[in-house]
């Protein structure tokens, strides 16, 4: 098995696990705007968008940051988050799965 194939399988598995957790899925997808593009948000904005408790959203954002699914940028004393390249690949897996489901 070549390295790219192994990497693709791991991304698909990660996407499936996130997709099975409603909170994790909502937090990750909050970073995608209505045009399907990645957007920058702070943790409070994510919590308000998806209407989940701040502690839950903050913990999920922190875990995604530690896992490398989102990137953090300091703006003054605040931190802004956006999808990393890995996070974008996971979202692409969600989109691909949705298209497959529509074609069934």
Curated annotation (Swiss-Prot):
Disruption phenotype: Loss of plasmid replication. TubZ levels increase, TubZ still polymerizes. It comes from the Bacteria. The keyword rRNA-binding does not apply. Changing residue 77 to A: No DNA binding. Residues 43-50, 54-65 bind DNA. A miniplasmid containing this and downstream gene tubZ is able to replicate in B.thuringiensis subsp. israelensis and express insect toxin proteins. The miniplasmid could be used to make plasmids for insect toxin overexpression. One of its GO terms (molecular function) is DNA binding. GO terms for biological process: plasmid partitioning. Changing residue 74 to A: No DNA binding. Changing residue 67 to W: Dimerizes, decreased DNA binding. Keywords: DNA-binding, Plasmid, Plasmid partition, Repressor, Transcription, Transcription regulation. Changing residue 63 to R: No longer dimerizes, decreased DNA-binding. Induction: Probably part of the tubR-tubZ operon. Coiled coil: none annotated. SUPFAM superfamilies: Winged helix' DNA-binding domain. Although this has the same function as TubR of B.cereus strain ATCC 10987 there is little sequence homology and the dimerization interface is different. Homodimer. Binds to tubC DNA, the TubR-DNA complex binds to TubZ. The pBtoxis plasmid encodes all the major endotoxin proteins (Cyt1Aa, Cry4Aa, Cry4Ba, and Cry11Aa) responsible for the mosquito larvicidal activity of strain 4Q2. This is DNA-binding transcriptional repressor TubR. It comes from Bacillus thuringiensis subsp. israelensis.
